[in-house]
Amino acid sequence: MNNVFDQYEVWFVTGAQLLYGGDAVIAVDAHSNEMVNGLNESGKLPVKVVYKGTANSSKEVEAVFKAANNDDKCVGVITWMHTFSPAKMWIHGLQQLKKPLLHLHTQFNKEIPWDTMDMDFMNLNQSAHGDREFGHICTRMRIRRKVVVGYWKEEETLHKIAVWMRVCAGWADSQDMLIIRFGDQMNNVAVTDGDKVEAEQRMGYHVDYCPASELMEYHKDIKNADVDALVATYFNDYDHDASLEDKSTEAYQKVWNAAKAELALRAILKAKGAKGFTTNFDDLGQTDGSYFDQIPGLASQRLMAEGYGFGAEGDWKSAALYRTVWVMNQGLPKGCSFLEDYTLNFDGANSSILQSHMLEICPLIAANKPRLEVHFLGIGIRKSQTARLVFTSKTGTGCTATVVDMGNRFRLIVNDVECIEPKPLPKLPVASALWIPMPNLEVGAGAWILAGGTHHSCFSYDLTAEYWEDYAEIAGIEMVHINKDTTISCFKKELRMNEVYYMLNKALC
C-alpha cells in the first residue's frame, strides 16, 4: 500500500526582522535549515517538512502564505519566531491563510549558555519574546491554530507535531472527498440526517445521491471470471470451512454473489472518484433486473480496510468521518472501524456495550484472522443467506468519535473506551467489539446521550482525543470529550456553556 502521507508536505516559516543586521539574518536562516533537517531526520514525523525561508516583512509573509494556499501538496504551515518579529507584519498574510496553522514555541538552543551569553546572543535567540508577539496577533485575529511548546528535538514535541500532521493530512483528503449514497437514509431516522451544504462548507466533503439502479448497471457488467478470481482470494485470505468451497452449495453461491457485489461497488466508486459510500438495506436494486440479494456486507468490510469511508443506513457523516479516521490512522499498528452501539451488558464495574452491526465492521480491528462465513440475515427488503467476515476485536484502549448536526453547528463527540474480551457468541455470527466507555458505562453512555451522540461511531485504537481536538480546531466545530475524569454535572455545564458560546461566536463572526 502506498504511504498516503508521501503526497503531502508541511511548510516551515521562520519569523524575524532586519533590525538585528545581516549576520543575524544569516544565522536565523542557518538555524532554521538545521532544525527542519533535524525534524525530517528524526523519523517521528509522517509528513515531510519543507523550509520556506525566513519572513522579515509583511510582503514576504503574504507571499509565502498565498503560495501555501495555492499548493495542493502543502497541508499545513508551521511558524516559529527565531527573533522578535513585529506581529503587524503578519496580519495580511494571516488574513489570507487557508491552510491549518501550527505555532511552534521552541528555541534553536536547548539551554541558556550562562557563561557566554551576551546581548547579541540574546537578541538573536528571543523566541520567548517573538512567539508571544505572534501569539497575540493570532489570538486578536481569532486565528484557529495548534500551539506546541517544547524543544524541537524532544520526543513529546515531535509527537504533538506528528499528531497535527496526521490531522492535516486527513483534513486535506476531505477537501476533495466525494461520498456516494446508494439509496437514501433509513426512513424516519434523525441522527444520520443533517445539512449536507453546511457539511461541505465546514468540513470540505461533498455528498451525492446515486440510485441503486445505476449501481446495478455496473453489477450487470461484471465478468464471471473476475468474480471467480475474487472468490479465490477470499478463500486464500480468510479462514473458512472447506465445505464453503463446494460450488454446488447455496453457501458458495452467496460468497460468489458477495464477490460480484464488491466488484460492482469498486467499479462505480472508481468511476465516480468517490472516497466513501453508504448503503441502505431497503434499496438493493429491482427484482426485475440485476440486484443485490442482501446488503453488500463483505464488500463493505473489505473496502473499509482499504480506506473507503462507509456509513450504514445512509449515514453519510459517518462515511466521511471514517475515511478521515483511516487516513489519520495510516502507519499506526492497531486499526480502525465503523461501529454501532448494539446491546448493553450490565455487569457492575465491567458494564459494557457490544459494538457490532448487521455485517459491516472493518477487519483492521480483528484480534485474529477473520473467518469467512455465510448465515441468514433477516432484515431489510431482502432476507437471505449472506457472506460476511466474523471476528472479535483486539482488546485495549481506544477512542471513538461521531459528528452530529445540532441545527446551528456540528458537534464532534469523542469518548475514550476500553475494549475488553467478550464471551463467545455462538448464535451471533458477526464481527464485534465489546467496550467500556470511560469513565464507566453509567457516566460514559449518559454523557454521550446528553451530547446527542449517534448509535454509529468511528473507532480507532491508535488515535486519541488530541487528534480530534486538532481536527475540531481546524474545522471550527464544537468538540466534547468524554473521558476518565468526566462527571455528568460538569458535562451538562459544558454543553450549556458551549450552546451560548457558539451562538454568540456565530453572531460575532
Curated annotation (Swiss-Prot):
GO molecular function: L-arabinose isomerase activity; manganese ion binding
GO cellular component terms, semicolon-separated: cytosol
Annotated catalysed reactions: beta-L-arabinopyranose = L-ribulose
Annotated pathway: Carbohydrate degradation; L-arabinose degradation via L-ribulose; D-xylulose 5-phosphate from L-arabinose (bacterial route): step 1/3
CDD domains assigned to the protein according to its UniProt record, in alphabetical order: L-arabinose_isomerase
Signal peptide: none
GO biological process, alphabetically ordered: L-arabinose catabolic process to xylulose 5-phosphate
Alphabetically ordered keywords of this record: Arabinose catabolism, Carbohydrate metabolism, Isomerase, Manganese, Metal-binding
Cofactor note: Binds 1 Mn(2+) ion per subunit.
Binding positions for Mn(2+) per the UniProt entry: E313, E340, H357, H456
EC number(s) reported in the record: 5.3.1.4
InterPro entries: Ara_Isoase_C (IPR024664), AraA_central (IPR055390), AraA_N (IPR055389), AraA_N_sf (IPR038583), Fuc/Ara_isomerase_C (IPR004216), Fucose_isomerase_N/cen_sf (IPR009015), Lara_isomerase (IPR003762)
Family: Belongs to the arabinose isomerase family.
Function: Catalyzes the conversion of L-arabinose to L-ribulose.
Protein name: L-arabinose isomerase
Protein's organism: Bacteroides thetaiotaomicron (strain ATCC 29148 / DSM 2079 / JCM 5827 / CCUG 10774 / NCTC 10582 / VPI-5482 / E50)
Upper taxonomic lineage: Bacteria, Pseudomonadati, Bacteroidota, Bacteroidia, Bacteroidales
Gene symbol of the encoding locus: araA
